[in-house]
């Protein structure tokens, strides 16, 4: 496991080497894997990871269903709420459905509407790894939404490299380092041989050069 001080040093370098900008940049992390056969589905990583401090960006969430879940969704301030009729309508509006699928990071759906979702929205959500998390009747979705607001989705498919946003330049190095640590711990727990299967890790700001993290 990488020491926190090593991560903080790499983050400081990434910020120092980045050209000064008049906007808040994202801080991105890239992980390159090795010694793993990604043609085998069982080796692929598909994880939702909670970042202790969030990544500093708005995470858009859509809730699909009716009744109590809609009330909770409104109270939670989710970006999109869709009932059964709207789900079915989107089945005949592929362009709009694709836009919704690309703009929202997470989807929650009442179990009662999952069959509708699969039929009408599955072709748009499935390939993006955004099929909804089923929510049984009576479940309080507010803590789920709160958790997802601070989460990132990693889906490698058959790729040996993947990148994700772990913070912004407005956040402290300590906060971003703790986010990176959470990602590394989860990824290593999914690799059969742990850090032996990690080739390299890089950190960069949106417009800055990549800085290698010493493993």
From Swiss-Prot:
Ranges that cross the membrane: none
Stored InterPro entries: Ribosomal_uL1, Ribosomal_uL1-like, Ribosomal_uL1/biogenesis, Ribosomal_uL1_3-a/b-sand, Ribosomal_uL1_arc, Ribosomal_uL1_CS
Pfam families the UniProt entry points to: Ribosomal_L1 (PF00687)
The UniProt record lists the keyword Ribosomal protein: yes
Record's GO cellular component terms: large ribosomal subunit
CDD domains hit by this protein: Ribosomal_L1 (cd00403)
GO annotation terms (biological process): regulation of translation; translation
GO MF assignments: rRNA binding; structural constituent of ribosome; tRNA binding
Keyword list, A-Z: Repressor, Ribonucleoprotein, Ribosomal protein, RNA-binding, rRNA-binding, Translation regulation, tRNA-binding
Task of the protein: Binds directly to 23S rRNA. Probably involved in E site tRNA release.
Oligomeric form and interacting partners: Part of the 50S ribosomal subunit.
Family stated for the protein in its record: Belongs to the universal ribosomal protein uL1 family.
Protein name: Large ribosomal subunit protein uL1
Lineage: Archaea, Methanobacteriati, Methanobacteriota, Stenosarchaea group, Methanomicrobia
